[in-house]
Structures are given as structure tokens and as C-alpha cells.
Amino acid sequence: MEKVDRIIQMEIGRINSHLPKARKSLCELLKEDSPSIELRDGSLHYFRRSELEFLKTLAGEEACLVKLPIILELSTLDRGYFVVRGRGEVRVIKKLLELSEDIYLEENTVRLPRYYLPTIRRKLPTTTVYAFITEW
């Protein structure tokens, strides 16, 4: 069973190669001429400036707390939901989806139904990314 687990972990690592090596704050990216980050596979991912400006309006005073890209975690255990982590990121997603602050009380993590994913990705295509998480 050990070998199978190792193979699964390698495959998950490979399908997550599009994730960033390190994330940058929204404020940092807005200062760059060509806002981008380096991915785990060594390539660069570029952000649309218009999208960054839109996020800034959603984040308000907390713009520097928002780390990009916002990671949408998809788990093998919790198939009907996804998770967003980080205070700034959670606030932005709640505002984007027009969710009441008191519906999802946790401040640093939010677990939402997957049917919100198309809306998020349509409005934030360059500033959000999927992460595939295996749990068993």
C-alpha cells in the first residue's frame, strides 16, 4: 500500500504544478508593471490589471491582506464543497458572492458549496486557482 500512496502523492503533486511557489499581496502586484508570480513548474503566471483593480475595490482597506492567487481548495473527502483560506481572501470571496458576513462566521476560512465555483472563476479568472487536496 505504501507504493500506491507514494504514486498518488506524486500524481497530485503533478496536477498541482500550476500552484504558485509563493503568493504575493494585492498591494505588491498593483505596484508591478507586469504583475506576475512564479509557479511550481517554473513558468510565470500573469494577472490582469483590471482584475487586480476590481479586487482592490472589493477588499477596500484590507487590500494588502489579500494574497494572490486566491486558492480554491478541492478535497477528495468533501466533494460537494471547496475551501478558501486567509482573512483577506475570505472577505473578498464573500463580497464577490454577496454573502452575508454572519452566514459564514469563520473569519480565516470559509467552506462553500461547489456551485459557487463557476461564478468565482468567471469573475476572477487570473486571480483564482484550484488546488487539489487528497485526504483519506
From Swiss-Prot:
Source organism superkingdom: Archaea
Cited Pfam families: DUF61 (PF01886)
Protein family (similarity comment): Belongs to the UPF0216 family.
HAMAP family: UPF0216 (MF_00585)
Protein name (database record): UPF0216 protein PF0452
Species, as recorded: Pyrococcus furiosus (strain ATCC 43587 / DSM 3638 / JCM 8422 / Vc1)
